[in-house]
Amino acid sequence: MVDFSTSVLAVRGCRIRLMRGGAGSPLVVLHGASGATVLPVMQQLAEKFDVIAPEHPGFGESDTPDWLDNIHDLAYFYLDVLDELKLKDVNLVGLSFGGWIATELAVRNTQRLASLTLCGAAGLYLAGVEQLDPFLRGDEQRLRDFFYDQIISFRNSDDRENFSPTAH
């Protein structure tokens, strides 16, 4: 099992928590709305890659900067993170909400990426479909937006006692 270290990285005046483990080509994992953690699959990937898992601004122990207003701000921020870490030919993995960020990053600078992998990506723009901004919604509304099946959203809620699923 590969050990992951935790450090703090400051970029554009914003301090974010960064987990890193393994060796090899860089593989950046952008977490979903539930937060950053070292997942079992990341342990396996760290056997072949230098796995880098930043915690998004506004999540967990990372700062919430005044300039953070939308998903586009996060995409540009992560391009600056890649610069700060001096990463090239990055394998970028986006999980759920992180998939949205990864997609926005990729359309802004494909030259930095060796690959793009999206897992259950949220927030992708489709013509005729309302685009939701999770920064403008409360925790319960975000869960309702992200999960069609309310039982799944209930299982993922940290506040189960106050959560009331609705039928679709």
Roles of regions detected by a PLM:
Residues 31, 90, 94-99:
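Conserved alpha/beta-hydrolase "nucleophile elbow" surrounding the catalytic nucleophile
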Residues 100-108, 113-146:
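Flexible "cap/lid" loop of the alpha/beta hydrolase fold
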